[in-house]
Amino acid sequence: MRFTENFERAKKEALMSLEIALRKGEVDEDIIPLLKKINSIENYFTTSSCSGRISVMEMPHFGDKVNAKWLGKWHREVSLYEVLEAIKKHRSGQLWFLVRSPILHVGAKTLEDAVKLVNLAVSCGFKYSNIKSISNKKLIVEIRSTERMDVLLGENGEIFVGEEYLNKIVEIANDQMRRFKEKLKRLESKINALNR
């Protein structure tokens, strides 16, 4: 398989890109130890990652990422006050409160390596993990969990929900954040099993 032949070069390129991103402060700090562990394993390398986030986003319509604007973004638990401050910045389009679980893309040397990683990730609670793509250049595993939240808060400067409701969704979001951060810790503690 060509992706196996190209593995060493792809890993070298990915590690160089990660080093640049680390220097620029573009990598979520709490996921760095896990990335380093994965990258230290001979048959794997990370290509992109997010440790999970809570956000408030303004966009012309749902799904328009190109024209979307972050009003608040956190890779940690968030307070109601922080969310309210982000909401105050809303002017036009739709206003969304979003939770996204962690996502990691990992290159694997062989199909067997990819399957081992998917099985490990699923056993750690990342139920949506899968083999994302197979090409001549790379074999990519996507590690992803189930936590997600999409709540429309307002549109064109008008807010549809009250503070009591916002407080409840912030509580739920923080609960999801704690849950997926625990899954990341579990994965980090078990990732060395791939060395066997």
From Swiss-Prot:
Domain of life: Archaea
Keyword GTP-binding assigned: no
Main enzyme class: transferase
The UniProt record lists the keyword Repressor: no
GO BP annotations, alphabetical order: tRNA methylation; wybutosine biosynthetic process
Molecular function GO terms recorded: tRNA methyltransferase activity
Reactions catalysed: 4-demethyl-7-[(3S)-3-amino-3-carboxypropyl]wyosine(37) in tRNA(Phe) + S-adenosyl-L-methionine = 7-[(3S)-3-amino-3-carboxypropyl]wyosine(37) in tRNA(Phe) + S-adenosyl-L-homocysteine + H(+)
Protein keywords: Methyltransferase, S-adenosyl-L-methionine, Transferase, tRNA processing
Matching Gene3D superfamilies: tRNA wybutosine-synthesizing-like
Pfam families to which the protein is assigned, alphabetical: TYW3
Family as reported in the entry's similarity comment: Belongs to the TYW3 family.
Known role: S-adenosyl-L-methionine-dependent methyltransferase that acts as a component of the wyosine derivatives biosynthesis pathway.
Name assigned to this protein: tRNA(Phe) 7-((3-amino-3-carboxypropyl)-4-demethylwyosine(37)-N(4))-methyltransferase 1
Organism this protein belongs to: Pyrococcus horikoshii (strain ATCC 700860 / DSM 12428 / JCM 9974 / NBRC 100139 / OT-3)
Gene: taw3-1
